Amino acid sequence: MAECFLYNNCNHRHCDDSCCIRKDRVGALLKMSLLPEKHWVRMSLITDFDGTDLEEFKRLFNIEKNIGDFVSKGYSLFLHSKGSGNGKTSWAIRLVQAYINYIWPESDLTECKALFIHTSRFLQALKDNFSSKNDYAIYIKNHLDEADLVVWDDIGAEMGSDYDINQ
């Protein structure tokens, strides 16, 4: 039997041998968020070896710990750096996971409360949607206004041509 994606982040109070209410509800909310299933397991994050990102790490950890307050106050966050591979997407994933873990007991599972949008995929989906129906673009369009938390991942990773940008 595969290990539950919540195993390291669960007190096992909402399950028995045959079912887990929390896993079912969190799984449904994660699916609605469009976060790929391979990212449902909470990953550990550490600071750089030299500690250069310690203050940013502490700030993001504090936001994660107080994610309900952060979202309810309508705060925004833009994670950026000069390079890749330094944890921006990992932190964005952790924040989506934290929010869903915060709201799952009260959520009625009829609204998409968080969205994880891979920006280049979304832009391509919008282009594709001109010639034929694109389910990814339509889903985001239909749920963007109701989501309390929206992550635009890799927003600056791929620059389009001048033609693409001006369309």
Model-derived features with residue positions:
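A short hydrophobic beta-strand->loop->alpha-helix junction that borders the nucleotide-binding pocket
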Residues: 111, 116-126
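Conserved RecA-like P-loop NTPase ATPase core
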Residues: 47, 118, 153
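Conserved nucleotide-sensing/catalytic segment adjacent to the nucleotide-binding pocket
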Residues: 124-167
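A short, basic N-terminal segment
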Residues: 1-69
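Walker A/P-loop nucleotide-binding motif
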Residues: 70-93
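Residue-level preference for the first positions of well-ordered beta-strands
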Residues: 74-78, 113-114, 149
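Conserved catalytic network of the ASCE P-loop NTPase/AAA+ motor domain
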Residues: 70-71, 106-109, 142-145
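Post-Walker A helix-loop "phosphate-sensing" segment adjacent to the P-loop in P-loop NTPases
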Residues: 97-114
